[in-house]
């Protein structure tokens, strides 16, 4: 009986050590490890408006945001700001680092491509993720890259991409909302130390504890290399906001990230916010 208990204990210890090792390997060390781009897109898909989207990504039970960029021991509140031009929207996700500094986390880029078609991607900011990380909706039921097989279904349409079917997001409630004639571009009213009454910051989790909580968001979103929403990106670029504080705090992590990226064969990204081809992340 004692031998059996020892054996079981050894197995448990081995599995725990293996899981810890894998978590360490998957972490990039960049702040972006603590924000789920896939989770943000899922919240955007669920939200009926940009205002509701802002509330969802800042809700503790959604497990999308685990960022503490200024190191004060509390989760950062993420503002949403819509930069728009004609049928193009760039929803900027931004954190107030201090009274005088802000930092962009990511931007959701949306373009209307027809009367009832639209394409969307979220792009993680280079200062937060180490490089631009692009994620889009996928009908494939698994995270994939541009070389994977194409999906199918009523919400998909071709974008002249030989290997992928790009999801039509026009019928997402929030997308329909922003294309209404009476829509006024959403600009979050909140700022440093002035936040909505329903929101209370919480202490950030360690990466190995946070990652399993947002793991399920990866299933219906693809990490891709192709930047499809080019007009929206041009609209956003002049408004990009960077924080000196964030760049200073992440200088070492950014250097390590670049070394790891340079060593990777074929230019594959480090895997903190997504996996390679054929693997769920």
Predicted stretch roles:
Residues 9-18:
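Bacterial N-terminal signal peptides
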Residues 19-23:
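Boundary at the C-terminal end of the N-terminal hydrophobic targeting segment
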Residues 24-43:
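Short N-terminal segments immediately surrounding and downstream of signal-peptide cleavage
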Residues 39-59:
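Extracellular/luminal recognition modules and glycoprotein regions
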Residues 76-81, 90-94, 107-109, 119-123:
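Soluble periplasmic/extracytoplasmic beta-strand elements of cell-envelope proteins
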Residues 98-107, 112-272, 276:
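Low-complexity segments
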């Amino acid at each position: 009986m004692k031998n059996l208990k020892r054996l079981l204990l050894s197995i448990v210890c081995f599995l725990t050590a293996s899981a810890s090792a894998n978590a360490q390997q998957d972490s990039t060390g960049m702040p972006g490890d603590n924000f789920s781009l896939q989770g943000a897109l899922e919240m955007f898909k669920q939200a009926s408006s940009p205002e509701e989207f802002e509330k969802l990504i800042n809700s503790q039970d959604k497990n999308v945001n685990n960022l503490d960029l200024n190191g004060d021991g509390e989760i950062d509140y993420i503002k949403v700001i819509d930069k728009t031009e004609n049928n193009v929207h760039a929803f900027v996700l931004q954190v107030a680092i201090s009274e005088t500094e802000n930092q962009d986390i990511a931007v959701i880029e949306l373009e209307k491509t027809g009367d009832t078609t639209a394409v969307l991607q979220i792009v993680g900011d280079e200062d937060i993720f180490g490089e631009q990380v692009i994620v889009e909706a996928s009908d494939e039921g698994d995270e994939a890259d541009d070389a994977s097989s194409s999906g199918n279904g009523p919400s998909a349409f071709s974008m002249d991409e030989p290997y992928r079917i790009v999801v039509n997001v026009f019928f997402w409630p929030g997308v329909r909302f922003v294309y209404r004639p009476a829509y006024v571009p959403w600009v979050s009213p909140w700022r440093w130390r002035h936040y909505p009454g329903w929101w209370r910051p919480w202490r950030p989790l360690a990466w190995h504890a946070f990652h399993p909580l947002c793991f399920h968001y990866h299933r219906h979103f693809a990490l891709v290399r192709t930047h499809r929403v080019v007009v929206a990106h041009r609209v956003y670029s002049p408004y990009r906001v960077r924080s000196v504080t964030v760049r200073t705090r992440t200088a070492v992590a950014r250097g390590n990230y670049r070394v790891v990226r340079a060593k990777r064969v074929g230019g594959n990204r480090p895997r903190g916010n997504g996996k390679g081809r054929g693997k769920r992340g």
